[in-house]
Structures are given as C-alpha cells and as structure tokens.
C-alpha cells in the first residue's frame, strides 16, 4: 500500500499534458484529503474504487507515463488491458467499469467476480478519475434544496429542520447545502470518522453523539431563523425512531446513506462500525439480510415523518427499492429528487460542469471564477453560487470548482478556460469533466430517469450514445459504468473529461465535446416529450430529425 497525493506544479512526467492530466486526476482521486479509504483504493460510495488493486494501479501509472499522444489505453474495471494506436484527437483513455450482462447484473454475481479479481465497482467518478471531493455534489444538492424551498417553504429553508443520514463522499454535501439555504440540518452517521471529516472541511458546523443536545441546538437555530448543521453520531434507524417518539417536528426528511450496497455501504441497526466489519467478513449473507431489514425500517420511519407533515424525498441511493423488495409496499410514496426538483434543468441541457487546476494553484480557480462571472452576468443563480462557494467551500486535493451550466454555456466556458491557459492567465492546463449524474448520460429508473413522461425510464441506449458521441467528439477520457449511485442492476451511465491545455487542438475538441455532451441531455428529453426540451432544441438549433413528432399533442 502506498500513500498517494495529488501532484501539483508545472513539470510533467508523462509525454504530454493530456496524459499528465489523467495521471494527476487519478492521484487526486486517492489523495487522503479526497478519498474515503485510499489504502483500499476506495474513493467514495461504499466500494467505489479508482483501480482494481494496487498491481493494476501501478500498471495504469506506468502505461500513462509511456503513452504517446496518438495512443489510447483501454481500462476494464480498473485494470489496463490494451494500448492501441489511434490519433491525436481521440481519447487517451477509454474506461468501462462493472458492466455486467443484464441477467447477471446483481450484487451476488458482482461480489463473486470481485472476489476472483475480475471486476471493480467504479461508482460514478471514482473509477472515471474525476472525483473532486464533496464539492462535486454540493451545487447539485444546493440547487435541490433551493428548489424544495421554492416549492414548499416560500423560497427559503430558514426556520426549517431537515433530518438526513449519510455523511460519506456524496452525503457529506448535505449539511453545507442546507445551511447555504439557511436551513437547519441534523445529519446522522454511524461512522464518527465521516462526521469528523465533514467538520474538518467545514461542511458541517458541530458534532455530537447526544440526541437531546442535537435537538436543542436544532430548535434554537430554527427559532433564530439561522442555518446550522449538526453531525449526529449514531445509527439512522435508532435516531429516527427516537425523534418520532419525542414528537420533535421535522420539516424535511431524506437520506444519503450508501444504501445502494447492502453489504459494503450500509451498517445494520444494532451494530457498531467495527462489529459490522467483523460480521461482513464472517457471514456476508446474514449481513445483507440484516442490512436490508434495517433499510426497510428506515424507509418506514421516513414514511411516518411524511405522514406527520414532513416533505420527504429519495436522494438517489435506491433505499426505496430495497425497502419495497423487503415488504414495504408503499416505499415509493415519496418521490425521487430528480422528478421532484431537477428535471426541468435537465430539459435545458443544464448540469454539472466541474474543473480542476492541474497546477495545484488556487489562483487559477480564482481567475476561472472571475471569467465565469464576466461570461454569464445575467445568471443570478450561478453568481449567487459562486459567492457562496468562494466563501464556504474548502478545496480537497487539487483546487477545483463545480458549476451547473446549460447547453451553449458549457462550450463557452470551456473555450474561455483554454484561452486563459494559452495566454498564461492560468498557469497550467485545466481539466473539465462532470459527474455521471447529468441530463443525457444516465439510465437509472429509481433516480435520474425516474417517472419519465413517456415511460422510457429503463431505456439504456441514451447512456451508451452519450459515451459514443463524446468519444467521437474527442474527449480526453471517456467512461461507461454500471450500478453507480443505486447499485447493481439499476443504472447505466457515462462520463467524460476533456483537457484545456491552451492549444488549437484542445479548442476544437472542447467545442465539440462540450456541445455534444449537454446536447445529448436535450435530445433525450425531447424524445421523451418534454416541451421545455423541444423549445430548447429549436431555440439552440439542435438537429433532432423527428422533433415535430415529440411533445404534447
């Protein structure tokens, strides 16, 4: 086992900045500031890994250092399997993680292959080497809670208490996103080290293991109308039950535990983290049974909060499905966050635009933020987000920024970053990518594609087409994964990264990729009949052959 740290500076060890960018982002994924369990190559999300094992990691490293600028490395579930001569505008790396034939696409078969060293779970950005820590999900979480506030609480979360659980790589964004919307958050996690990490990075304000203290702090902050986030150490089922018994009013209930993986991601009721680890190794079958039973209780308690007046929503971890499979027949009585709050953004091709400064110099991000403000002065949501991000976001690993941008905006910003690198206003190349959670890159019936207007929730073609078009457009590294976010059998999704190194070649590739990628989001929603998407496609001149057959009749 090695200790990996994000590499910074202007000298490179690969044969070009593009290959260097891949290597640096791989290292960044495993920097102790970023990864949850770097010693096990685990980045986030249960067992979301950056490489299959240390031997494969070192082979990836070596291959990247030797890779020519007209070659492409193929990575199969975290292991480099081939290098082929392609051309300079082709991707340097193509990645496929944990993709199983549908009949075998379940955790039992995956775990069997995993034990044999034949596969790896890549989550979304763990195995595609573009994770930037909790900031990567903060703006999406912020936008979700902002929209919830608009719909249910007169535009703001001031004077409300949100109860949630899970403070891992994804869930760790919740406390900050809620306080950014002026709400109070009680965030439960059984693993104290996760609470500590969120306190250290200033995503969470205070820590306690005492429920009464947490409720007192929450009530006081609520009465003052101030934002406050409380990391409460404990088991979610126990805590939720106790809060219901005390009759404490919860305004919003959700969950971001790693319920997508009942073996490695969720700790059953009645077990400490250490006890769970022992049982997991000794009797995995029993562990999964206990874990799923706890999840069923967990959802029943969420439904009870909903019955008592709380706004309830699923935050994309598949906990409703597990509960439904274990006898909770009304598990889907509360909606997922995408149909409830995010889909209108997807219809316009709006979604994640994240970038990292390969130099390691925070000044490069400051200059990029300044440029974003100049380019989009009319985008009030974006400007408000940048103000909050600059004030409250701590960098993990390489300095980075996340911003939600739409069709046309992404290409405009990408080209601007390339120009700033070319002119020396930014000191080294910038990596531009996104989460796989985006407008046109995912098929996930319990999350991103839940309740599609035309019933096409489970159609996986769109995620495949996204990977194909971004490869054709010349992304720097392109990935296709299975099971991210919601677990085996429940999702297919694609990722893209493109490097702005200041060159004319990069300019061509950036313009293509940052147009095709959000364009897929618009096309996917046009095909499903969403009028906002149809209007966007017509306004932006996106060529969709059968557009006149789409939409409401």
Curated annotation (Swiss-Prot):
Its cofactor is NAD(+). NAD(+) binds at residues 45-46, 123, 169-171, 189, 194, 235-236, 256-260, 266-267, 315, 485. The keyword Cell inner membrane does not apply. The keyword Cytoplasm applies. Gene3D superfamilies: Urocanase like domains, Urocanase superfamily. It is an enzyme of class 4 (lyase). Binds 1 NAD(+) per subunit. Signal peptide: none annotated. InterPro entries: Urocanase, Urocanase-like, Urocanase_C, Urocanase_central_sf, Urocanase_CS, Urocanase_N, Urocanase_Rossmann-like, Urocanase_sf. One of its GO terms (cellular component) is cytoplasm. Pathway: Amino-acid degradation; L-histidine degradation into L-glutamate; N-formimidoyl-L-glutamate from L-histidine: step 2/3. HAMAP family: HutU. This is Urocanate hydratase.
């Amino acid at each position: 086992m090695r200790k990996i740290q994000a590499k910074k500076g202007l000298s490179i060890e690969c044969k070009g900045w593009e290959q260097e960018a891949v290597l640096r982002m791989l290292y960044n994924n495993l920097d102790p500031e970023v990864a949850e369990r770097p010693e096990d190559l685990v980045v986030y999300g249960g067992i979301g890994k950056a490489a299959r094992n240390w031997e494969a990691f070192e082979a990836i490293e070596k291959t990247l250092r030797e890779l020519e600028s007209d070659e492409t490395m193929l990575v199969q579930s975290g292991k480099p399997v081939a290098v082929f001569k392609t051309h300079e505008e082709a991707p340097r790396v193509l990645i496929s993680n944990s993709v199983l034939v549908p009949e075998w696409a379940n955790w039992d078969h995956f775990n069997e292959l995993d034990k044999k060293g034949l596969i790896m779970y890549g989550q979304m950005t763990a195995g595609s080497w573009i994770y930037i820590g909790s900031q990567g999900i903060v703006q999406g979480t912020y936008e979700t809670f902002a929209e919830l506030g608009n719909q249910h609480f007169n535009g703001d979360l001031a004077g409300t208490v949100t109860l949630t659980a899970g403070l891992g790589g994804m869930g760790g964004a919740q406390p900050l996103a809620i306080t950014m919307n002026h709400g109070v958050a009680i965030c439960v996690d059984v693993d104290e080290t996760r609470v500590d990490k969120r306190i250290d990075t200033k995503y969470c304000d205070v820590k306690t293991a005492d429920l009464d203290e947490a409720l007192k702090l929450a009530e006081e902050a609520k009465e003052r109308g101030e934002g406050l986030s409380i990391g409460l150490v404990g088991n979610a089922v126990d805590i939720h039950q106790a809060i219901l018994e005390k009759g404490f009013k919860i305004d919003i209930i959700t969950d971001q535990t790693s319920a997508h993986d009942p073996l490695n991601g969720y700790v059953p009721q009645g077990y400490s983290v250490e006890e769970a680890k022992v049982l997991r190794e000794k009797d995995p079958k029993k562990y999964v049974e206990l874990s799923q039973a706890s999840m069923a209780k967990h959802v029943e308690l969420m439904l009870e909060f909903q019955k008592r007046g709380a706004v309830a929503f699923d935050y994309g971890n598949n906990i409703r499905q597990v509960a439904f499979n274990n006898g909770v027949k009304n598990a889907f009585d509360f909606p997922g966050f995408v149909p409830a709050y995010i889909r209108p953004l997807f219809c316009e091709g709006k979604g994640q635009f994240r970038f990292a400064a390969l130099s390691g110099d925070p000044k490069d991000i400051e200059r990029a933020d300044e440029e974003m403000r100049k380019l989009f002065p009319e985008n009030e949501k974006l400007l408000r987000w940048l103000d909050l991000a600059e004030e409250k976001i701590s960098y993990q690993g390489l300095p980075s920024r996340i911003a939600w941008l739409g069709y046309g905006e992404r290409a405009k910003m990408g080209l601007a970053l390339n120009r700033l690198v070319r002119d020396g206003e930014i000191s080294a190349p910038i990596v531009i990518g996104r989460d796989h959670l985006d407008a046109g890159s995912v098929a996930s019936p319990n999350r991103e594609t839940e309740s599609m207007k035309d019933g096409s929730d489970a159609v996986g073609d769109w995620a495949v087409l996204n990977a194909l078009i971004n490869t054709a457009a010349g992304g720097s590294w392109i990935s296709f994964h299975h099971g991210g976010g919601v677990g085996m059998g429940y999702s297919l999704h694609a990722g893209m990264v493109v490097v702005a190194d200041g060159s004319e070649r990069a300019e061509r590739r950036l313009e293509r990729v940052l147009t095709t990628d959000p364009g897929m989001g618009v096309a996917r929603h046009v095909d499903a009949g969403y009028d906002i998407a149809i209007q966007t496609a017509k306004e932006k001149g996106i060529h969709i052959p059968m557009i006149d057959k789409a939409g409401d009749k």
